[in-house]
Swiss-Prot record:
This is General stress protein 30. Keywords: Stress response, Transferase. InterPro entries: Polysacch_pyruvyl_Trfase. It comes from Bacillus subtilis (strain 168). It is an enzyme of class 2 (transferase). The gene is yxaB. GO terms for molecular function: transferase activity.
Length: 343
């Protein structure tokens, strides 16, 4: 089999955008990452960015090959032709294992059942199946697909998900933080001004708009405010080549703010990277809350709250703004993932 034959038959756009085609056929042990996002959620783009850095930093002797989400079917067919016994199949991490984002879940089922004879991992995820007839029906489909693969490991990124995975699946399970927390990025020194509200506009949103208006009015007494989201509406897609640019732009936007108020897990994590004081509210099933409680509670410039009394929140924000930002070292918490890839 030659690269030309692969290209001629099945090397479509979205398969291996991060390497030269020849890399598909070299003698290195390969790590195939499926589900690499092309949609405009910068949190998920940052996860994919961090996954690549993690594998390349810890295992430079592996060939890391991404398959974009829009090329899943073609990617499965091509990888079947070139995969070897000791290669590893991954599906990208995030907060989409469950029935809320079925297109992604259906791809994950396909991948894990297609490669049931190979070492496989769902990278750090939050898991949520709604307690509805539809949610439970989809959970059964996911169980049926995953249980075909006795070589599957599921990485849970909070204790809430760890419990769900243990109850729901027969798979091996490991516990690590979100992949973006593995990044070692020195933030740019930027002039800071204003309060940046980074808020959901999707099916996970639970923060009340009247409450948001109250918070904005409070902030506007002393500074200007801006509202945005970590899902970009200025572009339709983000391919591999543009991922880093959009991620760094989001970090700069957060790093030039005096304060971030958010209900987004990754806006909180981006605030940690840029040392930006951040007040965090919840989503519909506790992703940010449980990640904060499990890994980040020792940080003095980040605070999670369920409160909605503006006066009380003012005092909380004052504390955050006065803090000299500290650090948290989570490197040891990624050891289970290093051990997985090392074996």
């Amino acid at each position: 089999m030659t690269v030309q034959e692969i290209k001629g038959k099945k090397l479509v756009k979205g398969i291996a955008p991060n390497v030269e085609p020849e890399a598909l056929l070299n003698d290195k042990r390969k790590v195939f990452l499926f589900g690499s996002p092309s949609y405009t959620n910068i949190g998920d783009q940052a996860i994919a960015y961090a996954e690549e850095k993690f594998i390349k930093n810890h295992f430079p002797y592996y060939e890391y090959i991404e398959i974009m989400d829009y090329a899943t079917d073609e990617g499965i067919e091509l990888v079947k032709e070139i995969i070897r016994e000791d290669d590893i199949v991954c599906f990208t991490g995030g907060g989409n294992l469950g029935n809320l984002y079925l297109d992604i879940e259906e791809d994950r089922r396909k991948v894990f059942s297609a490669f049931k004879d190979y070492k496989s991992i769902s990278l750090p995820q939050s898991v949520y199946f709604e307690d509805t007839e539809e949610g439970q029906k989809e959970k059964k489909k996911t169980q049926d697909a995953y249980h075909q693969n006795t070589n599957l490991t599921i990485a849970a990124r909070e204790t809430q998900t760890l419990d769900v995975v243990k109850e729901t699946f027969n798979s091996n399970v490991i516990f690590t933080p979100d992949m973006v927390l593995s990044l070692d990025i020195v933030p740019r020194e930027l002039e800071r001004d204003g309060v940046l509200f980074i808020l959901r506009a999707d099916k996970e949103k639970v923060t009340d708009e009247d409450f948001i208006s109250q918070m904005k009015q409070w902030a506007e007494k002393t500074t200007y405010t801006e509202r945005t989201d970590t899902v970009l509406d200025t572009v339709d897609t983000i391919d591999y080549a543009d991922r880093e640019k959009h991620f760094m732009e989001m970090l700069d936007r957060i790093g030039s703010s005096k304060l971030v108020i958010t209900d987004r897990l990754h806006a909180m994590i981006f605030s940690i990277i840029t040392k930006t004081p951040c007040l965090v509210f919840g989503n519909s099933y506790g992703k940010a809350k449980h990640s904060y409680r499990d890994w980040l509670e020792s940080l003095n410039f980040i605070e999670y709250t369920d409160k909605n009394d503006v006066e009380e929140l003012e005092r909380m924000i004052d504390r955050l703004l006065q803090a000299e930002p500290n650090d948290v070292d989570l490197s040891k918490d990624f050891q289970p993932l290093i051990d997985f890839f090392a074996s």
